[in-house]
């Protein structure tokens, strides 16, 4: 399993648009990809799951991937977080 922790830097946190961007990026991979926030873990391929967390600016989140393309998935999601200005 590969994982990376981020601090959310987007002013509006992870609301509908950024959640959709992350879900689309995660859905390209076969690995199981999860997002953990505040003790809750959701499937990062589920828009409703991600939005249900109510992630605000300054929050610490962990994205984990497990499967045949886990390293590629995590690298792509890290790139998405950075390019979209969502976190670091």
From Swiss-Prot:
Recorded coiled-coil stretches: none
Annotated PROSITE patterns: PTS_HPR_DOM, PTS_HPR_HIS, PTS_HPR_SER
Active site: residue positions: 15 (pros-phosphohistidine intermediate)
Highest rank taxon of the organism: Bacteria
One GO biological process term: phosphoenolpyruvate-dependent sugar phosphotransferase system
Regulation: Phosphorylation on Ser-46 inhibits the phosphoryl transfer from enzyme I to HPr.
Cellular location(s): Cytoplasm
Major localization listed first in the record, in broad terms: cytoplasm
Entry keyword Nucleus: no
Alphabetical UniProt keywords: Cytoplasm, Phosphoprotein, Phosphotransferase system, Sugar transport, Transcription, Transcription regulation, Transport
Entry annotated with the keyword rRNA processing: no
Function: General (non sugar-specific) component of the phosphoenolpyruvate-dependent sugar phosphotransferase system (sugar PTS). This major carbohydrate active-transport system catalyzes the phosphorylation of incoming sugar substrates concomitantly with their translocation across the cell membrane. The phosphoryl group from phosphoenolpyruvate (PEP) is transferred to the phosphoryl carrier protein HPr by enzyme I. Phospho-HPr then transfers it to the PTS EIIA domain.
Similarity comment: Belongs to the HPr family.
Protein name in the entry: Phosphocarrier protein HPr
Organism: Priestia megaterium
Source species taxonomy: Bacteria, Bacillati, Bacillota, Bacilli, Bacillales
């Amino acid at each position: 399993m590969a994982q990376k922790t981020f601090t959310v830097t987007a002013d509006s946190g992870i609301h509908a648009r950024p959640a959709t961007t992350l879900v689309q990026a995660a859905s390209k991979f076969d690995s199981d990809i999860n997002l953990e926030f505040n003790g809750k873990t959701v499937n990062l391929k589920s828009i409703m799951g991600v939005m249900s967390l109510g992630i605000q600016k300054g929050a610490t989140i962990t994205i984990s991937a497990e499967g045949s393309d886990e390293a590629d998935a995590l690298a792509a999601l890290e790139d998405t977080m950075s390019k979209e200005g969502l976190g670091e």
